[in-house]
């Protein structure tokens, strides 16, 4: 109750004050207009000065970057896409009108532009008006050469930086297909990023459907849903202008310009003055004042007592090892060793390789007629051809279905609050207004309150190890430590300075004199007095002996003690260096004459000498000769070809020339084969390897020259290139009685500015022209006629292809060999000796081949299938035995090994091809560990010595290991010893770069020539490896 009564006073005062404030406000509202003007004359003026701000000016510059390279300008019909761009851009800018956007910003538009190929031309500088820009746009002409998009972007950025001032919103519309032929200016990504740093917003628009989407995305700003969004100049499957692209880009431009220029400002209207406030309550007690100045410095303290002697220090660490002693004296010469035991017999050597042919023997007498032979086995399966190169991109597919409707736009900001108006009467429902413009994106909302706890989630997988955290904050101060031991007595301190004299206090008021009081009680003891030193007293009596003092510190080192007894014998030292050889002794007495030695090897015959010469020099091989022949290849190096297809053209030239035999060593001689090459693009870029080039005097030098040709990536001037080839190569260096062939490769139409009459520039009675057209366009009548014109109207000399990869097909290379060299001469040297085989083939001796396949996880499922096909191809290639006890021909077996207890015999030693192929189809991949030692032991025990007959008695036993050598070493030495006992001839096929050569050398019994290294399992099917492998095992 007391508290309530205490609060009634202040609450009553506040309540009364509030009522007075309301009355004062009502009184202010009741004042007449004249009085109001007299009371506050500045209110209306303030309102007039704080109306809505003026509409902001927003100048916008739009820059167009147009691609007129060959890949765009040469689309059928020529320059059709350029003409389309010249219609698209004016229609685009015609819809960019100066206006008040959303009644808040005043948009005004200016324009600029350039077009590019492998060079850049600015046709309209930034800031141009619509009329001058449109006039300049209609006057551009395409370059039809390479595509350097990065240089165009760099030039565009420089133009805008130089000609456009601050406060201008910059947009760029880049119309290109996204393909590039070079990046001499740093690349698209770098130049597009520099443009964005300058505040330029880039839109990427495709002129056709043959586009590189990734290149367009590299150009466009983020997000791509705004600046790329499948923009195109023409509608799908039509030549009409895509109006939807124009509308969407303009909508984004206006919205972005509005967001850049519009500045939100609050509407400020001053209100009337409020009522006078009430007197505040008495303030609370103030905080404690600042501490006073320090007092006078105290006197020096008494010296402390001397502390105890410290504890002994830790034991010292052992000293460093002494230096090595001097070399000892030379030891005595050792006694001669005992005689060694007899060595064990060496292992049986592997069969030798096929030797060179021996001397031809005398003709033998005719033998008896043989028995009629049985029907022959099916023929061998042909080699699998090499995988062709990837084809050109397919034609554009049908247009996709319309996309889903876009999401609703963001709601705009609320407008500024208006001034309160006069309350009107209730009106009727008005007509429905038009749909408003989409508002700009709203400001971020306030942070929401914490939501309710969700259900407990499942325990997540352990995440990856996070980065090292930042250094922790400095920890709080620790607790006060225990009191330390007394320190040693310190030196006497200096005398302190006298303190400053304090100020005198104010005198107090004199009070009335009081009566004498009663004696008070006894006071408290006074505070201790100051311990000033008194005068020295008289000496006291001698005291009693004190307690024993603390233990003293460690004393100084004593004198050196007497020497100790002799130590134990040390470890033996390293042997000293060998002594210098002594002087040469006197010459001994000649020994008795020895016994005759064993007969020597027979001397080398003439055939043996010739064999060594052929093996060492390789100069006795047969060679192919095509007679006096000149071949000129004319290859297309324009942008439309592409780098990959240009490489295929060069490979085609090299592969064909490989089939023509040796090249003339002297290009000026009247005989032999000479080869020239012309690569062409636009005018002035032709490059040639001439027929009479003295540097091209061998096949290897010609290959090197072809490989050094670089892709020009420009326009296509085919007629001028044919004229250049005839005048500069054929006409200038023609030889008498020499056949001349020309092979022309092109991908289609040439630049219309070139002269069509030059298509027949090679049509000479002594020149045979083969025209190779690659692409679908040659099915058209006009382009087919151009190809026939190049081939001098000879249809049999025209070759049509769909893909460039068909150039390097083996069948087509054979066809070109027959065209260029129809009647070759095979010239072999006359040898005095013929040869025969040292070792018979697999058809003339028994061979049992056991394949041991590493089925570990390093092999992989896909490579396992490739190995199965390899074993199957070997079974088809070899001549297999007719029965298990056949004394000739081969049998095969396959064992897949994994861990120590995982060995799988796919099929034992057999001659039946059907059994081999069915077993290979059933074989499964172990996907286990690798223990080659247990695999070898299992093969010997279960395949070589198997219950089903095992290896033949007099057959050569061959083990073929398919492994990388990364395996367990358990029982490896034992298994290698077992191979030696069984006279196994090993062969190792190691695939990949990660191999264990130590293990491979052991299982090959030390014969490194028996180890075949290949880069991948696809190489097992290549003829270069497969034929070599078959010759080795046979």
Swiss-Prot record:
In this chain, composition skew of type Low complexity spans 302-320
Please give the Gene Ontology molecular function terms for this protein. collagen binding
> How the protein sits in the membrane?
Peripheral membrane protein
| InterPro entries xref list | Collagen, Collagen-VI/PIF, VWF_A, vWFA_dom_sf
| Residues in VWFA domain copies | 61-249, 630-820, 848-1029
Q: Which domain of life is it from?
A: Eukaryota
Positions of glycan attachment: 155, 342, 645, 800, 912
UniProt cross-references to SUPFAM superfamilies, sorted A to Z: vWA-like
What's a single GO CC term here?
A: collagen type VI trimer
| Described function | Collagen VI acts as a cell-binding protein.
Protein name from the UniProt record: Collagen alpha-2(VI) chain
Taxonomic classification, please? Answer: Eukaryota, Metazoa, Chordata, Craniata, Vertebrata
User: Which gene underlies this protein?
Assistant: Col6a2
């Amino acid at each position: 109750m007391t508290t309530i009564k205490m609060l009634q006073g202040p609450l009553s005062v506040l309540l009364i004050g509030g009522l007075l404030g309301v009355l004062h406000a009502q009184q202010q509202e009741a004042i007449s207009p004249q009085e109001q003007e007299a009371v506050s004359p500045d209110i209306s003026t303030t309102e007039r000065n704080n109306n809505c701000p003026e509409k902001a000016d927003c100048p916008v510059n739009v820059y167009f970057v147009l691609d007129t390279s060959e890949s765009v300008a040469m689309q059928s019909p020529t320059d059709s896409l350029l003409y389309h761009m010249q219609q698209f851009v004016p229609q685009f800018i015609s819809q960019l009108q100066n206006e008040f956007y959303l009644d808040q910003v005043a948009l005004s538009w200016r324009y600029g532009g350039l077009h590019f190929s492998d060079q850049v031309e600015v046709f309209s500088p930034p800031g141009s008006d619509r009329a001058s820009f449109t006039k300049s746009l209609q006057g551009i002409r395409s370059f039809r050469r390479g595509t350097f998009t990065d240089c165009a972007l760099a030039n565009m950025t420089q133009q805008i930086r130089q000609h456009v001032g601050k406060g201008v919103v910059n947009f760029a519309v880049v119309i290109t297909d996204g393909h590039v032929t070079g990046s001499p200016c740093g690349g698209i990504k770098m130049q597009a990023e520099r443009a964005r740093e300058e505040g330029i917003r880039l839109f990427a628009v495709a002129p056709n459907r043959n586009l590189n989407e990734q290149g367009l995305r590299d150009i466009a700003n983020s997000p791509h849903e705004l600046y790329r969004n499948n923009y195109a100049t023409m509608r799908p499957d039509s030549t009409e202008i895509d109006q939807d692209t124009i509308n969407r880009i303009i909508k984004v431009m206006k919205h972005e310009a509005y967001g850049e220029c519009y500045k939100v400002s609050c509407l400020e209207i001053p209100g009337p003055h409020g009522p006078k406030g009430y007197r505040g309550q008495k303030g609370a007690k103030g905080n404690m004042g600042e501490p006073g100045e320090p007092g006078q410095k105290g006197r020096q303290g008494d010296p402390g007592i001397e502390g105890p002697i410290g504890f002994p220090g830790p034991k010292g660490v052992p000293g460093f090892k002494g230096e090595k002693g001097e070399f000892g004296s030379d030891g005595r010469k050792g006694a001669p060793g005992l005689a060694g035991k007899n060595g064990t017999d060496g292992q049986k050597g592997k069969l030798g390789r096929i030797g060179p042919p021996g001397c031809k023997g005398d003709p033998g007498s005719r033998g008896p007629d043989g028995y009629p032979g049985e029907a022959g086995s099916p023929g061998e399966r042909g080699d699998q051809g090499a995988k062709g190169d990837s084809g050109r991109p397919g034609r554009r597919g049908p247009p996709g279905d319309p996309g889903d409707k876009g999401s609703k736009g963001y709601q705009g900001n609320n407008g500024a609050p208006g001034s309160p108006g006069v309350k009107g009467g209730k009106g009727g429902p008005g007509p429905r207004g038009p749909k408003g413009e989409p508002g700009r994106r709203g400001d971020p909302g306030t942070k929401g309150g914490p939501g309710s706890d969700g259900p407990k989630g499942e325990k997540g997988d352990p995440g990856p190890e996070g980065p090292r955290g930042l250094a922790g904050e400095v920890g709080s101060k620790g607790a006060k430590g225990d009191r330390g031991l007394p320190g040693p007595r310190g030196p006497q301190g200096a005398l302190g300075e006298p303190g400053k004299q304090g100020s005198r206090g104010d005198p107090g008021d004199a009070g009335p004199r009081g009566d004498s009081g009663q004696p008070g009680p006894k006071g408290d003891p006074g505070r201790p007095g100051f311990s000033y030193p008194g005068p020295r007293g008289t000496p006291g009596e001698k005291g009693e002996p004190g307690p024993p003092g603390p233990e003293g510190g460690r004393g100084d080192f004593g004198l050196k003690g007497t020497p100790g007894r002799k130590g134990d014998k040390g470890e033996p030292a390293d042997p000293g260096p060998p002594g210098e050889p002594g002087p040469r002794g006197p010459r001994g007495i000649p020994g008795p004459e020895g016994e005759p030695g064993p007969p020597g090897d027979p001397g080398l015959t003439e055939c043996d000498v010739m064999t060594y010469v052929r093996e060492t020099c390789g100069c006795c091989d047969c060679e192919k000769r095509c007679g006096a022949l000149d071949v000129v290849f004319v290859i297309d190096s324009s942008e439309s070809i592409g780098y990959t297809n240009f490489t295929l053209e060069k490979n085609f030239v090299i592969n064909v020339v490989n089939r023509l035999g040796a090249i003339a060593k002297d290009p000026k001689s009247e005989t032999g084969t000479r080869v020239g090459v012309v690569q062409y693009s636009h005018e002035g870029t032709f490059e040639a390897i001439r027929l009479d080039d003295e540097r091209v005097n061998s096949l290897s030098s010609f290959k090197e020259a072809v490989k050094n040709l670089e892709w020009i990536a420009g326009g296509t001037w085919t007629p001028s290139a044919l004229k250049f080839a005839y005048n500069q190569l054929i006409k200038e260096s023609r030889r008498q009685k020499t056949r001349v062939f020309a092979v022309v490769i092109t991908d289609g139409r040439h630049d219309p500015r070139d002269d069509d009459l030059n298509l027949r520039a090679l049509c000479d009675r002594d020149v045979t022209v083969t025209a190779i057209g690659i692409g679908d366009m040659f099915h058209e009548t006009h382009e087919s006629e151009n190809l026939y014109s190049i081939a001098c109207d000879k249809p049999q000399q025209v070759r049509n292809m769909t893909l460039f990869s068909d150039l390097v097909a083996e069948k087509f290379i054979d066809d070109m060999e027959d065209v260029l060299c129809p009647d070759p001469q095979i010239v072999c040297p006359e040898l005095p000796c013929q040869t025969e085989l040292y070792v018979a083939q697999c058809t003339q001796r028994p061979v049992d081949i056991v394949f041991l396949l590493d089925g570990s996880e390093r092999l992989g499922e896909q490579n396992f299938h490739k190995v199965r096909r390899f074993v199957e191809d070997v079974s088809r290639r070899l001549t297999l035995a007719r029965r298990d006890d056949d004394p000739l021909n081969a049998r095969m077996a396959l064992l897949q090994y994994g861990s120590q207890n995982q060995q799988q015999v796919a099929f034992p030693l057999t001659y039946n091809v059907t059994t081999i192929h069915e077993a290979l189809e059933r074989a499964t991949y172990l996907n286990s560990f690798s223990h080659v030692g247990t695999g070898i032991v299992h093969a010997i025990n279960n395949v070589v010595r198997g219950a089903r007959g095992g290896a033949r008695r007099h057959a050569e036993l061959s083990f073929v290991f398919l492994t990388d050598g990364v395996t367990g070493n358990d029982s490896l030495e034992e298994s290698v010893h077992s191979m030696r006992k069984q006279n196994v001839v090993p062969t190792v096929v190691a695939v990949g770069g990660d191999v264990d050569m130590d293990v491979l050398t052991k299982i090959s019994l030390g014969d490194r020539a028996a180890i075949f290294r290949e880069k991948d399992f696809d190489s097992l099917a290549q003829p270069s490896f497969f034929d070599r492998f078959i010759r080795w095992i046979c």
